[in-house]
Regions:
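Catalytic cores of soluble metabolic enzymes centered on carboxylation/carboxyl-transfer
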Residues: 8-11, 30-257, 339, 369, ...
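SH3/SH3-like beta-barrel fold
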Residues: 268, 288-289, 352
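Catalytic P-loop NTP-binding/switch module of NTPases
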Residues: 274, 280-318
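Conserved metal-phosphate-binding beta-hairpin within the catalytic cores
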Residues: 1-26
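Structured functional modules or segments
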Residues: 306-384
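Conserved nucleotide-binding/hydrolysis modules and their immediate coupling elements
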Residues: 245-275
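Short, hydrophobic/aromatic-rich segments at coil-to-beta transitions
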Residues: 230-236, 261-267, 285
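Short strand-coil-strand connectors
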Residues: 238-241, 252-254, 271-273, 289-293, ...
Length: 384
């Protein structure tokens, strides 16, 4: 069998230590291909077919640096829990239109993308959560790092949460830039999630345009309204009310100017600084991909009946998966912090605990059942 052998190199001594051998390519093989210019897939197939390697070790030269970022269906800012769902919009570096061909690397392009994820595709927890790989190459490590940050800025996945925003924040951090991290760094690092203020402005701006669109207009026109009177400010209900005044060019009093918009990609100058995001506004939820991070704002149905408020006693599934164990029954008395249900997904177990002292009611969870993200498993009725 053909395979790849993995070693760990001690930079201080120059000694190499054997790690493992796999009868396949390593996930990181694009990094090797980027710095050597070799096609490892072609070489491995030739060896598997009985041909000798056409090169020797002396023929291999290393040029520049390369960094690979693995894109996973996980909530990195929420305990790295696996995620599942249907993608709504997927944009990889180099593709901006809804149905653009899969991103690929040109000869002079420092960024390569390997993936099989498209828009309107279902992502399940039944398989490995890796969705793709973004690889950046540069003459120096810093060149490669900057190219990677820019590429992750262009990566937008809506419909489910991924780790792209986390990867972008990590690659942009001072510690990663200065190469002062180690294998234990993430245990104590404070990689900050992007603030939701700018994404909220993007959603509010688009929502106001969609609300005010006329038969002769287009929601993404950038030259203002053509009617005789200025439009009145629009109140957009998101996680909080947001006032959009398109005539004055403000969102909650912050100056906003639309620069460009096409295929859900919107460029705004917010308080004088240019920003770009991918926005998808639907009747009940509005999503934004900004600096790789997905933000979702629920849009309340102000005309419909209010749903039953389950309060903090509703225990919901924080991830899609399988119910491993139900440790309570209807009517049981429970204490704050007591484990009620255990879920499993992607080889991870998560214990769901009671938020307070109370009594179990409306038990919907059953051992072995598959549950969706956000499904209500049971309710804890608080003590009087």
């Amino acid at each position: 069998n053909a395979g790849t052998v993995e070693f760990l190199l001690d930079d201080a001594t120059g000694e190499a230590y054997f790690l493992e051998m796999n009868t396949r390519l390593q996930v990181e093989h694009p990094v090797t291909e980027a710095i050597t210019g070799l096609d490892l897939v072609e070489l491995q197939l030739k060896v598997a077919d009985g041909e000798p390697l056409p090169i020797t070790q002396d023929d291999v030269t290393v040029t520049g640096h390369a960094i690979e970022a693995r894109v996973y269906a996980e909530d990195s800012f929420g305990g790295f829990l696996p995620q599942a769902g249907r993608t709504s919009i997927v944009r990889w570096p180099g593709s901006s239109a809804p149905h653009a061909p899969r991103a690929s690397r040109e000869a002079d392009d420092p960024v390569r993308v390997d993936h099989a994820l498209e828009s309107e595709q279902i992502v399940s927890t039944s398989y490995d959560p890796m969705l793709g790989k973004v690889i950046a190459h540069g003459a120096t490590r810093e060149d490669a790092r900057r190219a990677l940050v820019a590429a992750l800025d262009e990566t937008s996945i809506l419909g489910l949460t991924t780790n792209v925003g986390f990867l972008r924040a990590l690659a942009a951090s001072d510690e990663f830039r200065d190469a002062t991290i180690d294998t234990a760094w993430l245990d104590t690092a404070e990689v900050e999630k992007p603030d939701d203020e700018l994404p909220r402005i993007f959603v509010a701006w688009v929502s106001a345009m969609l609300t005010a669109v006329t038969d002769s207009g287009h929601p993404f026109q950038s030259d203002g309204w053509r009617s005789g009177a200025d439009p009145a400010p629009t109140i957009v209900e998101l996680d909080r009310p947001v006032v959009v005044d398109r005539a004055r060019g403000t969102v909650d009093g912050i100056p906003v100017r639309q620069i460009d918009a096409a295929h859900h990609t919107l460029t705004l100058a917010v308080d004088g600084t240019r920003h770009r995001a991918v926005v998808n506004v639907q009747p009940h939820v509005a999503e934004v991909a900004f600096r790789g991070q997905r933000f979702a704002f629920e849009r309340p149905d102000v005309f419909g009946d209010h749903a039953l408020d389950l309060g903090d006693g509703a225990i919901t599934a924080p991830m899609p998966g399988t119910v491993l164990d139900v440790r309570v029954a209807d009517g049981d008395r429970v204490d704050a912090g007591q484990v009620l249900v255990v879920l499993e997904a992607m080889k991870m177990e998560l214990s769901l605990k009671s938020p307070f002292d109370g009594t179990i009611g409306s038990l919907n969870a059953a051992t072995g059942a598959q549950v969706a993200l956000g499904a209500t498993l049971l309710e804890v009725q608080p003590d009087e």
